[in-house]
Each structure stands twice: as structure tokens, then as C-alpha cells.
Amino acid sequence: LSADNTLRRLQLILLLAFVVPRANAQWPQLGANPSHSGKVTVAAQPLLHLMSNIVYDPFVAQEQAAFNGDLYVHYQVPLVDDDGVYMEFKSGTFATPEHWETQNWSVHGLRWQDGALVDRWTAPSDWKPVPANGAAFFEPVFHSVLANGFLYMPGAGGTLMQIDRSDGHLVKRINPFSFLDPNIYVSGVPAADAAGTIYYGAFGLDAANPWNKDITGAWLVKVQPDGSSRAIPFASLVPNAPKPTDQCTYVFGVNASRPLPPSPSAVAPTIQCGGVRPGINAAPAIAADGTIYVVGVTNFNPFWSYLAAVNTDLTPKWSASLRNRFHDGCGVLVPYGTTSHNCRAGAAIGVDPNDNQPGSGVVSDDSTSSPVVLPDGSVLYGTYSGYNGVRGHLTHFSSSGVFVASYDFGWDITPAVWEHDGTWSIVIKENFYVAPEKYFITQLDANLKPEWQFKSTNTQACGRGPDGNVTCVDEQPNGFEWCVNAPAIDSRGVVYVNSEDGNLYAIGQGGIIQEKIFLQLALGAGYTPLSIGPDGKIYAQNAGHLFAVGGSLPRVHAVRH
């Protein structure tokens, strides 16, 4: 090679070495990447300053008033590329929680300008959540994804709206169906693979009686980078699910004799299963080999839930039931006794007292848990279960669908994954909701065994006054819940999470707190995700506010992907 060619090659190598990590540092979707690992390749900035505080949900006070101060709303993760931040905003009117369709949703494109995060454009959507008073108690999430140089957001009729990232105009509506049916709903969060192909769920409901009649259809949708799309019946991906009219084991009713089970040999009642459909708030995850992982649930009976692996041509690869996976009920996590919180004496060890069978994982429509693909191609999913103090279970399946292990917490969590030293670690919140309450951030090893925990020990509820000063009152003797549903991890393995005490925390490896910064008190707030930008700024949420936190590190430009 000539000296000039050698120099050009070295320049190219140096450029690629710089650009690729920066591109990987962007946060274009839930969990930052197709596998949802929640990790970026840059170090986050120090938690020195509140650099921005923007209200994106103007109805929080009304939403909290409807539920005695609690906020039962799910929000998207702030999406970040090198050009700016993309966040959902709500408008319209708030009537009642039973009529959340009176609200409107949009995406705002924000950009840093002279140290402030300013509005560039607004892209309105005609998306509406599934009707209230049904499977979801929490207001469902409206969530976008960045791919192919565009932003894609949910639209009406199970469609996807392709938005120009430079000015917010609608490029096209992508409709995988034959016409725009307002009774078909985008179900969950769109996810993009490394090539820019997007996957999301959708299902249809009866217009007059959406929740007492079964679904009219359910699909997994695939959208190619050129905008072509295809919808495959969701039931074809879960061949081991019961037929919609089958009877499926449910739980003992409210009038059943306590403690449960009503007798050691009691058999739980059955109800109609309903058609299998995607979870309302779950995103697909995509493995490095292109396998798509989705979760599904029978429409009338959530105790029949599934994790399915799908090939890139939308044919089924395998489907695993989440039913009867756990043996930690009576006599293990639930003591025998005579109160309603106990198991009846004589019940088989390990059963869930609610149905007298081994415990089952539920794909809850009030949870945002989404599958996470681990570095070896196996997959995690956080389920709901009630008998263990409504803590759920984190489940682990091999890449071939074999149930590997579970951990005694999985409620509303999409774990973050930190690769290090030839292995990986898994980060979750771990709240104990039943007295004595206690709240942890827990890091697990590759076998779901705890490596370390960081316990919430702050007892002070604080508030920021008009002058900016923070004052506190000691009123939470057990600490505060971790109100995070998807942690973020930077290149050093530092974990970023938010708490109901209003602080954003940076927790180092070993469970050592490195920094924290007060945002605003968030008692009773819904769980929210965090993101880290290419320049290391951290984007956190709290009660309808978007906060940007950081120090004074220089911003470095990256390519859009």
C-alpha cells in the first residue's frame, strides 16, 4: 500500500472506532437496543445539574386526584439521538379515568440550544388506547421508536405513522390491514431490529362491547424499512394456547372459604379462555440472530400467558407457557396459618393458594415488562404473580424455549443487562410491598443469583420551593419504592434508577451509591424508564415531567441510525 492509502485506511479505522460506539450510545427505543439490554457505550455525565424540566403530561394533578394521589399512567422512555430528544406529550382534555380516550397524544422533537432543551416540532397522532374498564387499569403507554432516520409512532387502527425527524411532518401512514378500522389498536411498544425492521402487536375489539366479547383478531406486525408491512395472526405464533372457547382454570372466587385453598383438595373454577393476543404494554425483543420474542395472554383469563419465539419470516419457532412454572407458594413464601394471608393447613407445599396449583406467571396488561435477550441468546421476562406479595417472578428461558430458572420478583420490570468479564449481570428493582416494606435495586448473576443489593434507606420526603430550595420532612420509616420499570446502565456499569423519594440515583458496582440528585417527590407515581444520550446526559421522568440531568462534559456528534 502507498503511504497515502495507508494514511486514509488509518483515518477510516479511527473514524469507525469513534462513530460506532457513539451510534451505539443512542437510545432509539425501549431498552436502548433490539435486545432491550438498557446499556450504552458511553459514561453518563455527573449528576450535577437539573438541565431541563419539561411538563409533558398536563393532567397529572387530575389523574392523581382520581386515585387519592396515585398516578396510574404509563409513559414512554425519552428517545435520544445525536440531533435531540423525542418525547410523548399529552393534550386534549382529561375527563375521567374511565374515558382516557378524550386525551390526545403526540411526539415533540426537542433540541439542545444554548443550554436549554427547546421544542422544535410537534407530530400529532390519532392513536387511542384500548377502551378503559377492561383488561388495563393503568392508562396504556403510547410509545415511539427511532429507525431508518425516521420516528415511527402508533396511529389509529393499528397503524404506524412515519415521521420526518427534522421537522415532524407525516411521511406516510403504514397500514398492514385492508382498511383503517378504528376498533383495531396498537398493542404495546414498537421495537426495531438492527436493520431497521419494526415489529409490534395489534388486536381488535368489539365496538359496542369491547371487554365482554372476545377479541375480533390479534396480530404481530412486521414493517420493513421501505414501509411495506405484513400482519400475521398472533394465534399462529402460540399454537399451544387453548382455543378461544375452551374453559381454562381460573382462581377461587371472593366468596371462597379463607384461608385459601378452600380445602387441600379444592379445584379452582374454570372460565372461558378467550383468544390469545399480545400484552397491551409489552414490546417485542429481537435477538442477534433475528429471532423475535413476544408475550401473549388469553383475553379473558390472564393466568394463561405465553412467551413465544418467532422467526424473521413470522413463522413460529417455539412457544412456552408461563403457567405452573413456580413451586414457591404454600409453605415456602406463603406460610401456613389461619388468616386470609396464609395457606390452609394441609395444602400441598409450593402451590399457589389462589388456584391450588403450581404458581403461574401472568402477562399483566398493567405491566410494561418486555422480553430481554441475554448475550447467549436466552431470554428474560418479568411476570406478575399475586401470592408472593404481588411481586411477580422474573423468568429465564433458553434460546430453544426450555425453562431455566426464575427469581422472586418480576413485576413491571424490563431488566437491564451489563456485560463484563466474559459474563453478564442483570439489574432489576425489587420492592417488597407487604409489611415489613423494604425496597432494593438488585443485581443478579447470569444464573439469577443475587450479586449485590442497594436498599432504599432515605426516610425524608422532600419538596422544591419556588425559590429552588429543597426542604424535607421525615415521614417514610421504611424508605421509598423504586419507581423504575427499565433501568439504564452506562459503560462503567453504573446503574441509573429513579425513586419515589424524587431522587435520581447513580449506583456503582457492588451496590455503592455514587451520586443522587433531587428531581421532585413522586409518591404513588407510576414506574418509568430512563435513558442516556450519546453525550452522557441522563433523561429521567417523574409525575409527568421530563428531566435532563448532567454536568459539563462536551457533546460529541454521532451518526443517526
Question: What are the residue ranges of the model-derived segments?
Answer:
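Bacterial N-terminal signal peptides that target proteins for export
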Residues: L1-Q11
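Noncatalytic, solvent-exposed loop/strand surfaces
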Residues: A23-R560
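Bacterial N-terminal signal peptides
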Residues: R9-V19
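Intrinsically disordered, low-complexity regions enriched in serine, threonine, proline
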Residues: N5-T6, V19, H557
